[in-house]
């Protein structure tokens, strides 16, 4: 009898080949749980510092509600990494964990893309996209580093293994070569994202950031084994498509109606846009994003747009912007510098721009409805955020105390805003009150309450560098420490005593030059009033350079006061 030949079947893959599939699904589930938890936190959480709780507990609660990257990323990665090391030996089956790093980086991308949607309908009621900018920056960096480590560790593993040809593994195998290309792109992105590089040429960083992200999303499924096409590639492509649709559907063309500028005195300018570009209602302190290119222009997609806070209220007849246009020139030659400086962006009446969309401020709804004791502190072009808030609360009958403090470098900035108020007929004459006032400080003497002499304006304002050169201005050199007599402009003819410069607003606006500025002194009445009202009725807003925000935030933490801020700086 003839014996049948023995057929030996050889496994195509080792027993660990599919070891990471379930882990990828686990990461996706954790991402979903995090989103649900985030929505619940913002809907029912408390950002108000309790007067009965310790300062440490209040700080943790505030950082948790404020989506502090250290807190939120710590929680997220603690959950993600719990089952990372499981079942397989790290010494004999290290390949499992090297592959797991790659799958982890790709499985986290859907969460990152989802949190940067604008608008984000799932979180729209209690969050704005600006809330996620610090989180997005650090989350993106971690995802990038994890993916890069995946590639580096494999190269090291093959290089030290005498039984493996590095060239054969890395170059001649198509799947691995694609991964090698991804690693090079990711490394280039990390180099461009280093602070000095990013600030030196933000446009380059932004272009590289977008192109590498798209390449990472599309090339990884070619490289990955086993595949990640479903559900990860499908989710990532869907979210990318939504990002693109948002930039098409909500965009509209606009023309500048008027521009009031005097570059020989100040870079602060007033720009007027048509009222029809925005919906009938928008919240005070909202901002818009403008691109100098049309939607059919590739540069519309490759280069960053520019955000501008709206200085108007919804009931106004036009949309007004009060902005600072970046310049490196000396006074008298500013306009030439603005036109030649590649880092600057300025709005011209003769050009057509694209309004990408309008976005609400990061201000809780209860602040608008319940706030009765309000203080607003701003520096430079931060007046564009502060002024509509002041007008909103000024018109409310139930507001018991309202004060706005504006810190500027020269009197010309005040003149421009005063002209804006006159042009729009905003005299605040209807409801005069001793408890409602605007104080303008012009580079006067400053008595430090905290060690702000150690705070420089070179602090990297990370919120403003995501997807834009942010609020184009030069307020970063408006440090609180500049409010002393040595820094006063010798050409400034502002009197040294307090005065009310206009008849229309004589009982409301006071200008102070060469005066010492201490926040506690300026807010004595505000602080006294806070002890007489419910905690959710007292709010302090701050907008300006980092040193001003730090001072305001510390004051609120010490006094257990609700704090809302918007950062202007580069």
Swiss-Prot record:
<keyword id="KW-0813">Transport</keyword>
<feature type="transmembrane region" description="Helical">
    <location>
        <begin position="101"/>
        <end position="118"/>
    </location>
</feature>
<dbReference type="GO" id="GO:0033215">
    <property type="term" value="P:reductive iron assimilation"/>
</dbReference>
<dbReference type="InterPro" id="IPR013130">
    <property type="entry name" value="Fe3_Rdtase_TM_dom"/>
</dbReference>
<dbReference type="InterPro" id="IPR039261">
    <property type="entry name" value="FNR_nucleotide-bd"/>
</dbReference>
<keyword id="KW-0406">Ion transport</keyword>
<dbReference type="InterPro" id="IPR050369">
    <property type="entry name" value="RBOH/FRE"/>
</dbReference>
<keyword id="KW-0249">Electron transport</keyword>
<keyword id="KW-0274">FAD</keyword>
<comment type="subunit">
    <text>Interacts with ribosomes.</text>
</comment>
<dbReference type="Pfam" id="PF08030">
    <property type="entry name" value="NAD_binding_6"/>
</dbReference>
<keyword id="KW-0521">NADP</keyword>
<feature type="transmembrane region" description="Helical">
    <location>
        <begin position="177"/>
        <end position="197"/>
    </location>
</feature>
<keyword id="KW-1133">Transmembrane helix</keyword>
<feature type="transmembrane region" description="Helical">
    <location>
        <begin position="21"/>
        <end position="41"/>
    </location>
</feature>
<protein>
    <recommendedName>
        <fullName>Probable metalloreductase AIM14</fullName>
        <ecNumber>1.16.1.-</ecNumber>
    </recommendedName>
</protein>
<keyword id="KW-0472">Membrane</keyword>
<feature type="transmembrane region" description="Helical">
    <location>
        <begin position="142"/>
        <end position="162"/>
    </location>
</feature>
<dbReference type="Pfam" id="PF01794">
    <property type="entry name" value="Ferric_reduct"/>
</dbReference>
<dbReference type="InterPro" id="IPR013121">
    <property type="entry name" value="Fe_red_NAD-bd_6"/>
</dbReference>
<feature type="domain" description="Ferric oxidoreductase">
    <location>
        <begin position="101"/>
        <end position="219"/>
    </location>
</feature>
<feature type="domain" description="FAD-binding FR-type">
    <location>
        <begin position="250"/>
        <end position="388"/>
    </location>
</feature>
<dbReference type="InterPro" id="IPR013112">
    <property type="entry name" value="FAD-bd_8"/>
</dbReference>
<feature type="transmembrane region" description="Helical">
    <location>
        <begin position="70"/>
        <end position="90"/>
    </location>
</feature>
<dbReference type="GO" id="GO:0000293">
    <property type="term" value="F:ferric-chelate reductase activity"/>
</dbReference>
<feature type="region of interest" description="Disordered">
    <location>
        <begin position="480"/>
        <end position="507"/>
    </location>
</feature>
<comment type="similarity">
    <text>Belongs to the ferric reductase (FRE) family. AIM14 subfamily.</text>
</comment>
<keyword id="KW-0812">Transmembrane</keyword>
<dbReference type="GO" id="GO:0005886">
    <property type="term" value="C:plasma membrane"/>
</dbReference>
<feature type="transmembrane region" description="Helical">
    <location>
        <begin position="204"/>
        <end position="224"/>
    </location>
</feature>
<feature type="transmembrane region" description="Helical">
    <location>
        <begin position="230"/>
        <end position="250"/>
    </location>
</feature>
<keyword id="KW-0560">Oxidoreductase</keyword>
<dbReference type="Pfam" id="PF08022">
    <property type="entry name" value="FAD_binding_8"/>
</dbReference>
<comment type="function">
    <text>Probable cell surface metalloreductase. May be involved in iron or copper homeostasis.</text>
</comment>
<keyword id="KW-0285">Flavoprotein</keyword>
